[in-house]
Amino acid sequence: MSAADLTAPAAVPPLEQQGDAKLRSQVRSAVIWRSGTQVFSQLVAWGSTFMVIRILSPADYGLFAMTSVVLVLFGLLNGYGFANAAIAQRDGGKDQLRQLFGLLIVVNVGLTVLQILLAPLVAAYYRQPIIADLLRVQALIYLTNPFQALGYAVLSRAMDFRRQAQVNVVSALLSAATALGCALSGLGVWTLVAAPFVMFASRALGTITAARAWMWPSFNFRGARALAGYGGTIMAGQIFWFMQTQADIIVAGRTFAPHELGFYTTALFLSQIVLNLRIGREGDLVERRHHFGHEDLG
């Protein structure tokens, strides 16, 4: 070996290789955090559900199933497709995020008002007056969506799935504690309203705080056509999934008594519990990787 070889500087990997290695490390970390915490969160949710099932009556679950049809439908229209579009266009900057925030507020305030107006009609369809009161209170959940979706978009742009996962764990624990506390307090079907609201509200506050995404919304939607088009396409495709999965509740809810529907939905939940165990959402990670301009996970 010559003296020149001894004094030569070590080879430095090209910047492209360094960036690719860093991104692979981010993806591995994200898979671990999302998979592990999602399994933990679902185990917490299932544990509280099994305890609450022993306390509430089948009629409580039947009434909740009737309202869930509306919640599932409007949940597909809550604007998360717009957030995914903003993640894909990560060079949009803060102005695009402010537009996204404004668009989410408009959509979810509209859903809130619409659900309140439709509540008496849904109650009349199911012949259960209490359904109207349940839907009016459940409509408040939509007001948490703009904050949660904005924080989700900011953190996903940064490939920061660790803080998202931590927020999800905390919100799952709070929701489980709320469900058990309300059930033991004798709140009946309102237990199934309070627990999801606590989960969504805590997740919204935690996500937007973790993302440090506090900003004023923009209601000037000029140039937001790409966001609206992408999000609208996603929502339209999900409508078919809604029709496939909720048709039985729509029909059975009008035909069966609440306690009979409660037996049906609880049995359906228990029979599908293993299938519903989703270990992470690696599809999200692959999509983020793709938008960073790479083709394979290495």
Protein language model regions, located:
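Membrane-interface junctions at transmembrane-helix termini in multi-pass inner-membrane proteins
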Residues: 27, 85-94, 144-168, 190, ...
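Alpha-helical transmembrane segments of polytopic membrane transporters and translocases
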Residues: 50, 59-78, 140-141, 248-250, ...
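Hydrophobic alpha-helical transmembrane segments
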Residues: 132-139, 167-213, 226-232, 260-271
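Interhelical loop/hinge segments that connect adjacent transmembrane helices in multipass membrane
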Residues: 2-23, 27, 162, 205-245, ...
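Membrane-interface helix-capping segments at transmembrane helix termini in multi-pass transporters
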Residues: 21, 25, 53-67, 89-100, ...
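Residue-level signature of transmembrane alpha-helical cores of multipass secondary-active transporters
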Residues: 30-38, 68, 104, 137-138, ...
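Helix-loop junctions and terminal segments of transmembrane helices
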Residues: 77-94, 156-157, 267, 271-298
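Membrane-water interface segments that mark the loop-to-transmembrane alpha-helix transition
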Residues: 14, 25-45, 67, 72, ...
